[in-house]
Amino acid sequence: MKKLLFFPVIMLALQSCAQKKDYNLIVGTYTNTGKSEGIYVYDFDTNTAAVKAKTVTKNVENPSYLALGDGNKAIYAVNETSETSAVSAFGFDAASGKLTFLNKQATNGADPCYVIADKKNVITANYSGGSISVFGIEKSGALSAIKQLVKHTGKSIDKARQGSAHVHMAQFTPDHKYLVVDDLGTDKVYLYTYNPDGGNKVLTVKDSVAITPGAGPRHLVFSKDSKYAYLIHEIDGGITVFSYSDGNLTEIQKTKITEDGFKGENGAADIHLSPDGKFLYASNRGSENKITIFAIEKGGLLSVRGYVPTLGKGPRNFAIDPTGKYLLVAHQYTNDVVIFERNLETGALTDTGKRISVGAPVCLVFAPVK
């Protein structure tokens, strides 16, 4: 009888281990507030939203945006420090959450606010510099010297915000053939042909798309089927929907993230799709501090499904966990991450009551533990 009981116990234990879905949650911050020490790594259980602190990497200046390197073995962080701005490379041990500093390279463009990485290159979007910086990746994961610096020129109609180019995001297209670059200062989205082995000509400008004057394009995300792209505007709180095909963006819809009659201040920030591709979420700071929920309809068009207060101030960044069950909002000014549960059928958000206390969080990245 003891032997018969032994095997079910083992099976239950194995099932429990198989069902436990832990990810690393990596948090970038602004250290110049005096409330943060650098880059934080937490263990996040996607079954329960339980969070456990793992590591803190200190002495990193303003790591305000992060990118996970290919193979989950490196992390790249911008150092958003005005004229001394740089990008730092770290080795990453996913099991322990430990980051090991490898090296740092100047971006030669002030205030990098976005970074991406693939197998060959690391690319930063430099806001105040109005430029894009390209670095190679060494075998160790360290950064090469800068390979290419692309500077934008021009301005738009908002004299306070758009007196010069302000590159806010650089992102690969789904086919990885092009780079999409959002320029808040010029009200344009640029498309570059991407040649990863191109030496000092990794990027070659292909085209640009003009956005509504005064809109302030900030972040863009592609649909799950790669046929559509959704661009959020920081200044006017709008979203432009494009059809996408082989490096070409064609506008098909304009909408907004605010309710009718809104008279407050916009500060549209981040935009993400649910993992199943059925819902789009967008955050607004300013006087709103809300997440707007959209359903993605036939033909990639958006329809509003609701508006949810984020329960904090300054939702600069948010992330949906890989299972799609939870949406986490990083509040820059109230120094916490609020965890919402997401209804997979309706897209609705419900506060779990769970919080992560961390100083000036502005970037959330999920990464596998193994």
Indicate where each model-derived feature is located.
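Bacterial Sec-dependent N-terminal signal peptides
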Residues: 1-23
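Beta-rich, blade/repeat-based domains predominating
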Residues: 35, 60-71, 108-119, 153-176, ...
